[in-house]
A protein has these predicted regions:
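Beta-strand-rich solenoid/repeat architectures in extracellular/passenger domains
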Residues: 1-13, 29-57, 79-111, 130-146, ...
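Right-handed parallel beta-helix/beta-solenoid
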Residues: 9-10, 18-32, 62-95, 114-132, ...
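Extracellular beta-solenoid/beta-roll
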Residues: 207, 217-221, 227-362, 366-367, ...
């Protein structure tokens, strides 16, 4: 499909573009729009594709691969199914590649890009590529409750070089449910009334992977990372993330690992009291974390990076506490704290480590007022 195209749908559960495999036919389905099939497709002036949906539960572009007998391709991301057990006998691939264009959705739970598949298990490896969507130089706007820009359920979505705006309540930049992979590269994203990335699951044994790469910027009204999944891995490289709520991580349940490299992170880290819930955060290569409020992580590694417990911004000190429930590792790390020089009851930032510490870390303490105890 080449050239300038316009696709408009007006009904509930409608689809702009669909790549689908199902049943016993082990045959791949691949749709390409203005793409030459390469990793970096070439574009021609005017070769834009515009997709607009107006209806609830609609999808702009959808790759669907055997989502289960109790689920349809356009079933909502978190619609439950007793058949969604995490295995697939059909290895056929549904793939949709779109280069250069715009996707706009209007309606409740109307996603711009949706990869809806069933994981293929190979030993201990989980493969979520049987349903995949790749968007390059595409801009996304969604209007509606829970109208996530990117949705993946045991599928893979890659977004490269574009802008994302979600305007409706609880509409995230991206959400993964019951496992999957999302990659954001050269992406500017704003979730005006939702979270940045939502990672959730209703079944055990599934993994969620998110890569935020190459100068991407994510801003959200609520937390950047909402986590309620068994196992998730998030990589942030050469990028910035922040939220209007000043919350970076909200880990309700499960094991969440976040690796930030040469990136700027703003917002607190929250974790539930569930003993099986853990947050492992690693900062490297000149990354900064401005925690903004009391924060808790399980493990923290600060490698040639900086953590601002609070900043010397001229305001009165509001004591902030960073709690590390397990271990801390420093490699030329820096921790910035503020304290009032007074008696034992003076306001001060704190770092509390319940486990072991290792490596080298410098603490930079700024006087927030006072001249010492007498």
């Amino acid at each position: 499909m080449q050239g300038k195209n316009t696709i408009v749908t007006t009904g509930d559960y409608s689809i702009g573009l669909l790549s689908q495999t199902s049943g016993n036919l082990n045959t791949d389905t691949i749709i390409r729009v203005n793409s030459d099939g390469s990793v970096t497709p070439s574009f021609s002036d005017g070769d834009d594709t515009f997709i607009v949906t107006a209806g609830n539960h609609a999808v702009g572009v959808l790759a669907c691969a055997s989502p289960g007998s109790a689920r349809a391709c356009v079933s909502s991301l978190d619609e439950e199914s007793t058949t969604d057990t995490g295995s697939n006998e059909n290895n056929a691939i549904a793939k949709l590649d779109m280069a250069k264009g715009e996707i706009t959705t209007h309606g409740t739970e109307s996603y711009a890009a949706y990869a809806n598949g069933t994981v293929v298990k190979a030993g201990d490896t989980l493969d979520y590529t049987n349903a995949s969507v790749t968007l390059t130089d595409v801009d996304i706007t969604t209007h509606g409750d829970n109208a996530h820009a990117i949705a993946a359920r045991q599928g893979t979505v890659s977004f490269n070089q574009g802008e994302i705006y979600t305007t409706g309540p609880d509409a995230a930049t991206a959400k993964i449910y019951n496992g999957g992979t999302v990659t954001l590269k050269n992406t500017s994203a704003v979730a005006h009334q939702g979270s940045g990335i939502g990672l959730e699951s209703s079944i055990n044994g599934q993994e969620a992977t998110v890569d935020i790469l190459s100068g991407s910027s994510l801003r959200s009204a609520n937390e950047i990372l909402y986590h309620k999944n068994e196992t998730s891995n998030v990589t942030i490289t050469d990028s910035e993330v922040s939220s209007a709520a000043d919350v970076f991580i909200n880990n309700i349940k499960g094991h969440l690992t976040v690796d930030a490299t040469n990136s700027k992170i703003t917002g607190s880290a929250n974790i539930s009291t569930d003993v099986n819930t853990h947050t492992y955060l690693s900062l490297s290569d000149n990354s900064t974390w401005d925690i903004k409020a009391d924060s808790t992580v399980s493990n923290l590694t600060v490698d040639n990076s900086t953590v601002y417990i609070s900043r010397a911004d001229g305001r009165d000190v509001e004591p902030t506490r960073l709690t590390i429930t397990e271990n801390y590792v420093g490699n030329n790390g820096v921790l910035h704290l503020r304290t009032e020089l007074g008696d034992d009851n003076s306001a001060t930032d704190k770092v509390v480590i319940n486990g072991n510490t290792s490596g080298t870390t410098r603490a930079k303490v700024t006087n927030a007022g006072g001249s010492g105890a007498y």
